[in-house]
Amino acid sequence: MAKTKEESAAAQTVETEAGGGLLDKILTDGRMARDDYQKERAKDMIGEFVSQVMSGELTMSKNMDVAINSRIAEIDRLVSAQMNEIMHHEDFQKLEGSWRGLHHLIKNSLTGPMLKIKVMSVTKKDMLKDFERALEFDQSAMFKKVYEEEYGTFGGAPFGALIGDFEFGNHPQDMALLESISQVAAAAHAPFLSAASSGMFGWDSYSEMSEVRDVAKIFDRTEYMKWRSFRESEDSRYVGLTMPHVLMREPYGAATKPTETFRFEEDVDGKDHKKYLWGNAAYAMGTRLTEAFSMYGWCVAIRGVEGGGLVQGLPTHTFETDEGEVAMKCPTEVAITDRREKEFADNGFIPLVHCKGTDYAAFFGTQSANKAKKYDSDAANANARLSTQLQYIFAVSRFAHYLKSMMRDKIGSFMSRKDCEMFLNQWINNYVTDDDTASPATKAQYPLREARVDVSEIPGKPGCYRAVAFMRPHFQLDELSVSLRLVADLPAPANG
C-alpha cells in the first residue's frame, strides 16, 4: 500500500515536470513573455484557459477564428460591465463632467494675448473654510487671488468673469458661500457664474419641474429666508446661477461613439436619466462670454438667438421607447417653455432653453441673482431693473477696470479737476453711439447710448477727486406682448 502511494506521487511529479516543460515551450515558441513577470502572468492565463476547457465552462469550436472571436466578445462584455460600474458612479461622473466642461470652454474660446483663461482647482468646502477663517471677506485668500493680485496691482490684468463649477442649493452653507463670493466679485467687478442645483428648488432632479405649477411660490416658503435675503443684497447682482444641466457627451457604443481599444457598449438606453453624463451650464455661458469678447471686446452680446446667446453643437442621443418610437434625449436635461423660462428669470436664475428637435439651445436672459427694488417712479424702477441684468453689469465692470487703471497712471501729474473730467469724458465717449438704428454688431462695439463722467473735489483732501460715471446702455428686447383683433376695416395707425 505504501509502495503504491510512493509510485503515484512520483508519477505526479514527473507529469508536472513534463507539463511545466511543455508550458514553457509554448511560452517560448509563442513569444508570449519578455520577462519573468510576464511569463508567470502568461502561465496563469493559459492555466485558467485549460481549466475552463476541462471543466466545460468554455466550449471549443473546430473553427479557431470563431472560437477566438467568441472569447474576445466575452472579454469585451465583462470589461464593459466593469467600465459601466465605474463610469456611472456619481463621483466619477462629477469628475468627468468637470473636465469635459472645462474642455468645452477652452475649445470654444479664441484665447490669446487679449483673452486668457486661468484655472484654479478648489472645492466649495475649501472656499467656505477660507472665508470662515478670515475676519472679513477682503482678508480671505480668494480676495487676494482675485482682487489684490490683479485688479489691485499696478500692471495687473483684472478678471472679467469668474466661473465656478459648483452647484448651489438652499443649504445655509451654500448661502453663506454665495454671499462671500458675491462680495469678492463685486469688489473686483468680475461677475461670478455658477449653477443652481435641483435641490435649490426642493427637487431631487430637474425632471420634477413639470410637477410644479408656479416656481415663485417655492421661494415664498420659510426655509428660503436666506435666499430672499441674499437677493436683496447689492452684491448679488454680481452672481449668475445657470440651470439646468447640459449633456457633456454621447454614450459610448458602436452606433454612437465607438471606442478603439475594445468593443465598449455603455449601458445607456434613454430610460435611466442618471446614466447620462451631465455637466455645468455655466461652462456654456462662459463660451458666450468669450465669443462676445473675441468679436467685440465686450461681454454684452451674450443673450438671445441672434444676440450672442446661442449654444450650438450640443451632444444628442436617440433611443427607442417602449412604444417602439425613436426619441431624442433633451441635451439640456429638461425642456423649458417660454412661460417657465420667464418664471426662472424672475426668480434670479439663468435658464438654458433647448430648441426642440435640434442640437442647439439659447440663453434668452442673463438675470443676476439680484431682485430689483421697487420705487414710486418709472425711471427709478427702470434703473433698478437694468442693474440686475448681467449683460449690463459686464459692460459697467469693464469701464470700472479701465477707469482705475487710467487714473492710477495719472497719479502725480498736474491735473486739475476740470482737466480730469474732460479727459474722462473724452475717453468714455469713444464707446457711445446715439444711432438707435445701428446694427447689433455696432451696438455691441459701442454698448452705450449716452455717458457722462462728473468729477468733484473731496473736501479736506487737496488733489483727491471723486468721479461718478453715468451710463445709459442700448436696451435689448426682453419681451413683446402681442394683441390680436379681428376687424372688418383697418383703422388708422396710432401717431408716434
Locations of the language-model features?
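Generic, well-ordered alpha-helical scaffold segments in large soluble proteins
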Residues: 49, 78, 82, 98-105, ...
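Long, charge-patterned amphipathic interaction tracts in eukaryotic proteins
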Residues: 97-170
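Short, glycine/acidic-rich hinge or "gate" loops at secondary-structure transitions
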Residues: 90-97, 115, 202-203, 438-445
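Long, contiguous, structured domain-core segments that constitute the functional module of a protein
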Residues: 263-422, 479-482
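Short, hydrophobic/π-rich interface segment
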Residues: 419-444
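C-terminal edge-of-domain segments
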Residues: 452-496
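N-terminal-proximal low-complexity accessory segments that begin disordered
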Residues: 2-125, 132
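Extended, regular secondary-structure scaffolds
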Residues: 151-331
